[in-house]
Amino acid sequence: MASSRASSTQATKTKAPDDLVAPVVKKPHIYYGSLEEKERERLAKGESGILGKDGLKAGIEAGNINITSGEVFEIEEHISERQAEVLAEFERRKRARQINVSTDDSEVKACLRALGEPITLFGEGPAERRERLRNILSVVGTDALKKTKKDDEKSKKSKEEYQQTWYHEGPNSLKVARLWIANYSLPRAMKRLEEARLHKEIPETTRTSQMQELHKSLRSLNNFCSQIGDDRPISYCHFSPNSKMLATACWSGLCKLWSVPDCNLLHTLRGHNTNVGAIVFHPKSTVSLDPKDVNLASCAADGSVKLWSLDSDEPVADIEGHTVRVARVMWHPSGRFLGTTCYDRSWRLWDLEAQEEILHQEGHSMGVYDIAFHQDGSLAGTGGLDAFGRVWDLRTGRCIMFLEGHLKEIYGINFSPNGYHIATGSGDNTCKVWDLRQRRCVYTIPAHQNLVTGVKFEPIHGNFLLTGAYDNTAKIWTHPGWSPLKTLAGHEGKVMGLDISSDGQLIATCSYDRTFKLWMAE
């Protein structure tokens, strides 16, 4: 056993030199330190290298190095349209979530209507409608709804104010006058209706033959007399009730009376200082009225209204109260009242027996130009520069008919003796015929090539209609039928006034050419 151990030990000792390996020598650790600190030191000392000034500049230009303050992060100023839309939509949704919308569906519909949106869409329920309103309000803002409501309230209030009936409190004399007019007009209306019944009993053949004779006579009308009336244009002419005199008004301020049919000057009425708009005879003048009484009335552009007798060249009285132009004057059929139209958008009624203004009637939006009275004395018709006409009941003060249809100013208005037709002449070159019974326009006559200055029905039966215009002519139209019968041509200037004698035998026209003409059948 000892020998075996010795042999093994010896074997080991003999093998050791072959397997001997050199021991590993420990190398000391190398500490490089912080590269960041060294780089900072190198940069601080201004050393050149890869990351020197040139390298730093190249890195910044290449976009590999970003130098920031650490507090502010700069972004691109330009934002794409898509990004802007996304931001706007985000803000809109944010606003929409903050808007309170009523859960009452009727109120939601009212809000949509106020905003001018459809109150409902196809297949839309209350929830979808409410959401649609919310989205709309998020775009236009809730102030839009408030503004719309305020505008609606204002328009509603103004509409209520417009529809509100307002009036001037009239004097007691107006009440007395209304009662007097009612008592005056009712018997005349009964008489007119009785005459219409008697006329209807006349055989049709007789009436037709009479109408044919009248039309034949009208077609034969010729210029019987032409007279220079003044140095200035003649604005108005009017026959006396007995058809023996003709009154003319001139722009020189003079009014003249002429004999008919020889056209001799009888009187020159001096009193106006400016353009005279109209002169009219009293309904009973030259028939039953004393020549010393008031027989004529005239008006002028300075607002003056004067009353005249047949015995004096000076005015008998002045009617004061108009501050602007008075366009027309007209006597009531009774002769007690005088109507005046004024450019202050009103017309007035004067009681000459009481010597006071009893009615100051407004209703037109512009100046009132012409006035006419119904032959019964119950109604008055006015035509205004606002292109509208009105028919007034003098017994109650109400406007019973509104004449709407002309495109321009109304310069003439007249009632037919049949009691239910009204004719109006306008600046739109037409003459319209209105029916009081139907309360509408029944016919429009394309009468002239220039503005129509006057209209006049034949005063006995209203069998024809006369119109005058700025196209230098006057025309005669059948009634009924409204077909042209005769054109009265001869004036060298605008036809400014016209009239038909009370017996229906003569027609007078006056013109801008300073002449007046009488027309008579051969």
Curated annotation (Swiss-Prot):
Chain intervals with Polar residues compositional bias: 1-13
Modified residues (N6-acetyllysine): 27
Any single GO BP term: RNA splicing
Outcome recorded upon mutating residue 192 to W: Decreases PRPF3 binding
Compartment(s) of residence: Nucleus; Nucleus speckle
GO MF, one annotated term: U4 snRNA binding
SUPFAM superfamilies for the chain: PRP4-like, WD40 repeat-like
Assembly description: Component of the precatalytic spliceosome (spliceosome B complex). Component of the U4/U6-U5 tri-snRNP complex, a building block of the precatalytic spliceosome (spliceosome B complex). The U4/U6-U5 tri-snRNP complex is composed of the U4, U6 and U5 snRNAs and at least PRPF3, PRPF4, PRPF6, PRPF8, PRPF31, SNRNP200, TXNL4A, SNRNP40, SNRPB, SNRPD1, SNRPD2, SNRPD3, SNRPE, SNRPF, SNRPG, DDX23, CD2BP2, PPIH, SNU13, EFTUD2, SART1 and USP39, plus LSM2, LSM3, LSM4, LSM5, LSM6, LSM7 and LSM8. Interacts directly with PRPF18, PPIH and PRPF3.
UniProt name for this protein: U4/U6 small nuclear ribonucleoprotein Prp4
Organism: Homo sapiens (Human)
